């Protein structure tokens, strides 16, 4: 049987996938400025005080972004870089701030998982230079 035009239109709409971080508009990250850093509580089975920041992105959209790690230095008008992917138990939080970029400092005294928390390699963890290259690199 032939389908009507309305039925064809329904089939097209059904296949579309919802974009979870629509505010980024096909970009991996966007820069923005903090409007209000605050603390929110998670959904029912969990109990905590999670820091989030309401931010205005460079494309004039407003998002609520999760602040990862312990402690932060964000104030009003701080510049942050935001990526997709929020906190599962915080409703309405669909983005995450990236640490160690622009005004947002990395977590202090962190040695493991440094790339997540924006920390450079400390000098005591420097790579060992192979013997045949020591003359070149001066070690």
UniProtKB/Swiss-Prot annotation:
The keyword Mitochondrion is annotated on this UniProt entry: yes
Positions of the UniProt region annotated as Disordered: 1-21
Compartments, as annotated in UniProt: Mitochondrion
GO-annotated cellular components: mitochondrion; small ribosomal subunit
Keyword presence, Ribonucleoprotein: yes
One Pfam family it belongs to: Ribosom_S12_S23
GO BP term, pick one: translation
Top-level taxon of the source organism: Eukaryota
UniProt cross-references to InterPro entries, sorted A to Z: NA-bd_OB-fold (IPR012340), Ribosomal_uS12 (IPR006032), Ribosomal_uS12_bac (IPR005679)
Keywords, sorted A to Z: Mitochondrion, Ribonucleoprotein, Ribosomal protein
Biased composition (Basic residues): 11-20
Molecular function as annotated in GO: structural constituent of ribosome
Primary location: mitochondrion
SUPFAM superfamilies: Nucleic acid-binding proteins (SSF50249)
Gene3D superfamilies: Nucleic acid-binding proteins
Similarity-based family: Belongs to the universal ribosomal protein uS12 family.
Summary of the function given for this chain in its UniProt record: Protein S12 is involved in the translation initiation step.
Protein name: Small ribosomal subunit protein uS12m
Organism for this UniProt entry: Paramecium tetraurelia
Gene from which the chain derives: RPS12
């Amino acid at each position: 049987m032939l389908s009507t035009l309305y039925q064809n239109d329904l089939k097209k709409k059904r296949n579309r996938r919802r974009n979870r971080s629509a505010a980024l508009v096909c970009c991996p990250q966007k820069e923005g400025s903090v409007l209000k850093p605050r603390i929110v509580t998670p959904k029912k089975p969990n109990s905590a005080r999670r820091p989030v920041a309401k931010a205005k992105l460079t494309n004039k959209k407003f998002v609520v972004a999760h602040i990862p790690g312990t402690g932060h230095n964000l104030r009003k008008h701080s510049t942050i870089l935001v990526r997709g992917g929020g906190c599962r138990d915080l409703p309405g939080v669909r983005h995450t701030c990236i640490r160690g970029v622009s005004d947002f400092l990395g977590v202090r005294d962190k040695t493991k998982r440094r790339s997540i928390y924006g920390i450079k390699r400390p000098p005591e963890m420097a790579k060992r230079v192979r013997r045949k290259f020591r003359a070149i690199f001066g070690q």
